[in-house]
């Protein structure tokens, strides 16, 4: 089939690679404009754009798809996108972590007679965790399960009917990085399955989302990553794993900011000394045991400013037990 693809990060790139490998023709790729990133702040293409360039797929990078924009440049980009999509022959549109809302007039083009509409890969069990950061929010909340939904898109925020749903257990030591990779692979497989069903002329059953259980996965802010040690050990552990790799949980040690990358719950009954929230109680083989508002957390991996990730014991032990990890304010 001929597919229009819209996506930006690596999660989306896995899907477009799988669609291409399955023999479908990507006739047009939408992706976000190049962004400055890295230490040199050089312009970098998105993973989806890099793939499209390799395969000579036409690319559009509008800043908005809304032709009503008051910004003349953005409005012109949206006009170009609308005209290009209207002129091209395609069977379906696939949208994965694109970063722009598709207005109804764009969806209408994909739903013209002979076309199958627009499909989205969403990394949660809808209607739980609609929105921008479903992977991180699921771990932060301590969810035991998540999954992937293939959704027939409508104009709402992740409100469309689901056509395929697969559940996945969240491992006890899961980070957003590891869960991202598992869900990206699952999503890529599912969208290929969905397109194969459509190509065979079969009808996929559309299931409206439940009215109950709706939650929203708001975009992750850097300020959320600062650890408040008066929280319970379980809450802090979930945050450390949720914010790995971005933005990285943060605390303050001996006057400088550090990143916390990995942790696990400890048996608080095993410690003879009890400190205040944020106190370093003692050291294990690799980790440092930190008193929390409730319970004890073993922090396993840290990173000093400008340094590499290292075992927390190696990071803190030169300072000694009794040091305090502090809550501090990060700027956005």
UniProtKB/Swiss-Prot annotation:
GO terms for molecular function: methionyl-tRNA formyltransferase activity. Its EC number is 2.1.2.9. It comes from Polynucleobacter necessarius subsp. necessarius (strain STIR1). This is Methionyl-tRNA formyltransferase. The gene is fmt. PANTHER family: METHIONYL-TRNA FORMYLTRANSFERASE (PTHR11138), METHIONYL-TRNA FORMYLTRANSFERASE, MITOCHONDRIAL (PTHR11138:SF5). It catalyses: L-methionyl-tRNA(fMet) + (6R)-10-formyltetrahydrofolate = N-formyl-L-methionyl-tRNA(fMet) + (6S)-5,6,7,8-tetrahydrofolate + H(+). Belongs to the Fmt family. It comes from the Bacteria. InterPro entries: Fmt, Formyl_trans_C, Formyl_trans_C_sf, Formyl_transf_N, Formyl_transf_N_sf, Formyl_transferase-like_C_sf, GART_AS, Met-tRNA-FMT_C. (6S)-5,6,7,8-tetrahydrofolate binds at residues 124-127. Attaches a formyl group to the free amino group of methionyl-tRNA(fMet). The formyl group appears to play a dual role in the initiator identity of N-formylmethionyl-tRNA by promoting its recognition by IF2 and preventing the misappropriation of this tRNA by the elongation apparatus.
């Amino acid at each position: 089939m001929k597919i229009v693809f819209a996506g930006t990060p690596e999660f989306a790139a896995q899907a477009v690679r799988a669609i291409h490998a399955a023999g479908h023709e990507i006739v047009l790729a939408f992706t976000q404009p190049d962004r400055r990133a890295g230490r040199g702040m050089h312009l970098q293409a998105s993973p989806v754009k890099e793939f499209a360039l390799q395969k000579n797929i036409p690319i559009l990078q509008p800043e908005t798809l809304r032709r009503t924009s008051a910004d003349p440049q953005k409005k012109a980009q949206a006009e170009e996108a609308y005209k290009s999509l209207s002129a091209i022959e395609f069977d379906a549109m696939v949208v994965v972590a694109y970063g722009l809302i598709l207005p109804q007039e764009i969806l209408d083009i994909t739903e013209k007679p002979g076309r199958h509409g627009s499909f989205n890969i969403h990394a949660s069990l809808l209607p739980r965790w609609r929105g921008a950061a479903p992977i991180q929010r699921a771990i932060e909340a301590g969810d035991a399960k998540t999954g992937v939904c293939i959704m027939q898109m409508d104009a709402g925020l992740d409100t469309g009917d689901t056509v395929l749903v697969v559940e996945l257990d969240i491992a006890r030591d899961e980070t957003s990085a590891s869960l991202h990779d598992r869900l990206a692979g699952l999503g890529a497989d599912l969208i290929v399955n969905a397109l194969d069903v459509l190509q065979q002329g079969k009808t996929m059953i559309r299931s409206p989302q439940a009215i109950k259980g709706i939650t929203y996965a708001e975009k992750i802010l850097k300020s959320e990553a600062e650890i408040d040690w008066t929280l319970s050990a379980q809450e802090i552990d979930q945050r450390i794993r949720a914010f790995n790799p971005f933005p990285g949980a943060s605390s303050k040690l001996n006057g400088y900011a550090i990143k916390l990358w990995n942790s696990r719950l400890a048996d608080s009954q095993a410690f003879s000394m009890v400190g205040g929230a944020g106190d370093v109680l003692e050291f294990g083989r690799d980790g440092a045991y930190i008193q929390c508002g409730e319970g004890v957390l073993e922090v396993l991996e840290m990173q000093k400013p400008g340094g590499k990730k290292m075992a927390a014991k190696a990071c803190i032990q030169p300072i000694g037990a009794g040091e305090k990890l502090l809550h501090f304010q990060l700027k956005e």
